[in-house]
Structures are given as C-alpha cells and as structure tokens.
Amino acid sequence: MAYRDQPLGELALSIPRASALFRQYDMDYCCGGKQTLARAAARHDVDIDIIEAQLAQLAEQPIEKDWRAVPLADIIDHIVVRYHDRHREQLPELILQATKVERVHADKPNVPRGLTKYLTALHEELSSHMMKEEQILFPMIKQGMGRQATGPISVMEIEHDEAGELVDVIKHVTQNVTPPPEACTTWKAMYNGINEMIDDLMEHISLENNVLFPRALAGE
C-alpha cells in the first residue's frame, strides 16, 4: 500500500509503532501531523521507498488500540492519567538532574548549557496548559460541547506548537539527546529520561491534535 500521500498523524494512529519510526527519523507527527509522508521525507532527506517499506512491515502487526473508535470521555481520562500525570512526575526530576549536570560538568565542552532553563520553561508551559485543559476544555468536551470549543481548542493547539518549539531547543542543546563519551551515569540517565519524556509528549499531542480535537469539533 502507498503511504506517501497520507498525513503523518493518520499513519501514526493506524500503524503500530509508526510513531517510533517517525521519531527515529525526527519527523514531527504530532504538531506537524497534517503533513504528508512524502513531504516529511523530502524535508528530512529520507528515501520515501525505504520508509514506505518499513511502514508496510509495521502495518502487518495488529494495532493495540484504535483511539479513533474510543469514546471521547475515555480518551480524556487516558490522557490525564497516562500523559498529564506522567509529565508532572518527569519534568521536576529532569530539572534536578539538569541542574546537577550543568553544575558538575560546567567545564566540559559538551555540557548541555541552558538545558535547565529550557526544561523549566517547558515544565511551566505544560503545567499551565494541562491545567487549562483539565479545568476548561476537557469538561466542555465531556458535556458534548465540543462544537462550542473552537476557541479553547485553537489556543491549545498553539500551545502544543510552543511546547514543540521548546522540545526542538532541548534537542539542539543536547545534540539530539545523545550523551557524549564522557557522560557520567546521571548525565546518561537524564538523557534517557528526556527521550522518554519527548516520546510521551509527542504521543500526547498527537492524540489530542489528531483524534480528540477533530472529533470534538465535529460534535461527538
């Protein structure tokens, strides 16, 4: 099957582990989920035939859960427990680790300078964002008022883009979250945690941008 003309967001939802493949190629399937596979491949200089073949192989596996068919209230409950609560645990710990690494390894050329600042900014951004979703937008959607939520949803999508921009900066200062040879145990553990946080955040944003919000606006 040809996947090149399909949006990344749709492919991430319909093919098991496609999201992990896109992350491997640094393709944005959450905030940039509306771009086609062909466009994303061209932007990242990826051979379209190779990635199509990889997707075809992944598509042979059964999908764990098709969120496009799950009731919106259940999706919201899942987002809060699986992603919101997790981000609230992840980011404070990563900030502590970054503070230590930047202090202890200040004289190393590969130290991720500014990482603490950018993780703190992301933590503040997401804390405010998630609170607004939980207190305003999610109750509206659960009450069947999705059609009236155009304004709040637009704001949330803009904030998703802003979070994505901060993630790009974090990836830049960490050499795409790759520890240098001299990295200590804390440094390596922090980068593992950052990679996990980015994976979670991309899945989180994708589920909202590509499933929850469109279905809510359609009046479900």
From Swiss-Prot:
GO biological process: protein repair; response to nitrosative stress; response to oxidative stress
InterPro entries for the chain: FeS-repair_YftE, Hemerythrin-like, RIC_family
One Gene Ontology MF term: metal ion binding
Chain ranges passing through the membrane: none
Claim: Cytoplasm is one of the keywords in the record: yes
PANTHER family registered for this protein in UniProt: IRON-SULFUR CLUSTER REPAIR PROTEIN YTFE
Subunit description: Homodimer.
UniProt name for this protein: Iron-sulfur cluster repair protein YtfE
Organism: Salmonella schwarzengrund (strain CVM19633)
